[in-house]
């Protein structure tokens, strides 16, 4: 058969049953603020970001360990305001934020990136600083390469087996950025 003709025929067919319009999700209760001296939760961070960012700002996400929390607490309001990698390529979002800021200079770009993911392409901080781009980076720190640990069984590790080289120290990302 002819693929073009087949697709055209499928598109010409009426829907067999009408699809209802999507309804907005119910609001999720605000997470509790951290107590003094305690670390904030990812949920509190994403909820707070949702409250303070403009609706037309662009989120560039690569925080695989926080993705379900991001989906729950950080609503996306318009097309072309949320970007992420499509197939697990680590190190995408720092440089992607630079590229998106170059492509959309009138928009505020917010990179939400895990600390492990950030280390794959940390030199993008230099590009963002050198080009004076409107990018804000939020580094979600769990002090590990979570994606590698979470997929360790696929790589042949046994349940609970330590994956060498995947724990991170407390990296000072502010100092790294200032060094740019």
Task: Please identify what each model-predicted range represents.
Residues 24-101:
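Active-site diphosphate/adenylate-binding microenvironment
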Residues 1-8, 69-180:
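Thiamine diphosphate
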């Amino acid at each position: 058969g002819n693929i073009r003709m087949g697709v055209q025929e499928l598109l010409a067919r009426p829907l067999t049953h009408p699809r209802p319009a999507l309804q907005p999700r119910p609001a999720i209760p605000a997470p509790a603020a951290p107590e003094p001296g305690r670390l904030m939760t990812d949920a509190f961070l994403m909820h707070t970001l949702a409250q303070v960012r403009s609706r037309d700002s662009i989120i560039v996400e690569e925080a695989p360990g926080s993705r379900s929390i991001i989906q729950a607490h950080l609503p996306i309001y318009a097309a072309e305001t949320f970007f992420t990698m499509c197939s697990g390529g680590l190190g995408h979002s720092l440089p992607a934020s630079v590229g998106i800021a170059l492509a959309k200079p009138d928009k505020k770009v917010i990179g939400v990136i895990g600390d492990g993911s950030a280390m794959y392409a940390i030199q993008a901080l230099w590009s963002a600083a050198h080009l004076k781009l409107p990018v804000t980076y939020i580094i979600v720190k769990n002090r590990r390469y979570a994606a590698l640990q979470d997929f360790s069984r696929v790589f042949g590790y046994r349940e609970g087996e330590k994956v060498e080289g995947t724990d991170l120290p407390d990296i000072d990302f502010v100092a790294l950025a200032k060094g740019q």
